[in-house]
């Protein structure tokens, strides 16, 4: 059994390791509210395109 077979072979069905950003596949700073599943960096980039408006 080589290294490639062992690496990342554990099932990830729940927890932080199971979810990733739909834009950049990052796993940190994920916004899951409203089913966005997008990291905070990508959210700042795509918020206007999604339909979020910044209030004064």
Swiss-Prot record:
The keyword Endoplasmic reticulum applies. One of its GO terms (molecular function) is zinc ion binding. Zn(2+) binds at residues 21, 24, 39, 42. Pfam families: Ribosomal_S14. Belongs to the universal ribosomal protein uS14 family. PANTHER family: 40S RIBOSOMAL PROTEIN S29 (PTHR12010:SF2). This is Small ribosomal subunit protein uS14. It comes from Spodoptera frugiperda (Fall armyworm). The gene is RpS29.
């Amino acid at each position: 059994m080589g290294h490639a077979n062992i690496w990342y072979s554990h099932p990830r069905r729940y927890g932080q390791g199971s979810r990733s950003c739909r834009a950049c596949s990052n796993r940190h700073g994920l916004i899951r509210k409203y089913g966005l599943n997008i990291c905070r960096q990508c959210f700042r980039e795509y918020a206007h395109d999604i339909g979020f408006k910044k209030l004064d």
